[in-house]
Amino acid sequence: MPKYNLLEAMKEQKRTDAKLTDKKQKIMEAAITLFAEKGYGNTPTSEIAKAAGVAEGTIFRHFDTKDHLLVSLIVPFLKDSIPLMAEELFEKLLSNHGLGFEDFLRNLLRDRLLFLKQNREIFQIIVKEFFYNEEIRHELMPYVAENIGSRLVQVIRAFQERGELADRPAEAMARHIFFSIGGTFILKFVFGLNGSRDEEAEIESAVRFIMDGVRNR
């Protein structure tokens, strides 16, 4: 599977925003560059301030915490990128027309596992913000629902027509799949549970759990 590091992608896609002050723009550009080069956890705010040519206190006047600085960077990027990322993901997963739904699900889990291993720190912070920040939920959820949820519903309906999946509302089945996969990855990457070194065994366990709820019997 191809690599896709969000911080590196953000660095390559530097954006300017006319609504930002010059100092805030410099802080955000410096943060993207340093996060991509050194990793989020290895980049102190003092180093961001030095690279941006501002006092460290200036960062905290614009962003309450380093986490909030990252969120201010990643949310606009995700809103721009989710449509294309979703399109490319589903095109890749469905390129084998003879694939059954169970294999589709297995490949989806493998792909997203690799993606999250490359973006663990970002995933941890975004999940935390989803729990506690209603504004972030309202900003991102419509993009997730429109670009990922709707595609998953279409896939489910196609496999229902082939007789592989139960004749139940596709939207409800999509929620079951989405929350099962999301829960699996949150337990693994945020809470450090499901920490088996045998990732294929973890994937197979998740596939069996999901298929038990959607398989045509």
Predicted regions and their residues:
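N-terminal intrinsically disordered/low-complexity leader segments
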Residues: M1-D22
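Short hydrophobic clusters on alpha-helical segments that form packing/core surfaces
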Residues: I27-F35, R112, I210
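Hydrophobic alpha-helical connector segments
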Residues: E87-Q118, A174-I177
